[in-house]
Amino acid sequence: MAFYGTNAAVAWVNTTGTGTIRDSFNVTSVTRNGEGDISVNFTNNITDNDYVVTGWTDNWEGSNSDSGGIVTGESNSCMAEDGTRIVTIRARFDQHPPQRQDFGVVCVSIFR
C-alpha cells in the first residue's frame, strides 16, 4: 500500500549498517563512509533541506537489553536535497563512551 500526499514519507530505507538495502522508497543507494557512518542518497531530490529525518536501529548485542542504538546527524550540515548522512551509535549503559557501530538493521524515514 502506498500513501502519497501532504505529510507522507518522501523517502525511507530499511538497510544494514554496511549499506545493503532490504527495501526502500525514493532511495537510490546507501553508502558506508566508515564505522557507523552512512549516507542515504535519494532517487529524486527533495525541494530543499527543510525536512525531518527519523531513525531506528536494532539492538547491537542481540538480546542484551542494556545496549541500544541511536541515530543522529553526521554534522550540522548533513541534510542536502539529494540525500542525508547519519551516524549510528551504540549506547551501552554500563560502558562509556558511546561508540559508532554498524548495526544489523537501520531504518531511516524522511518527511517533508
Give the residues covered by each predicted segment.
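Periplasmic/extracellular, small/polar-rich flexible segments of pilin-like filament-forming proteins
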Residues: 18, 24-27, 57, 70-71, ...
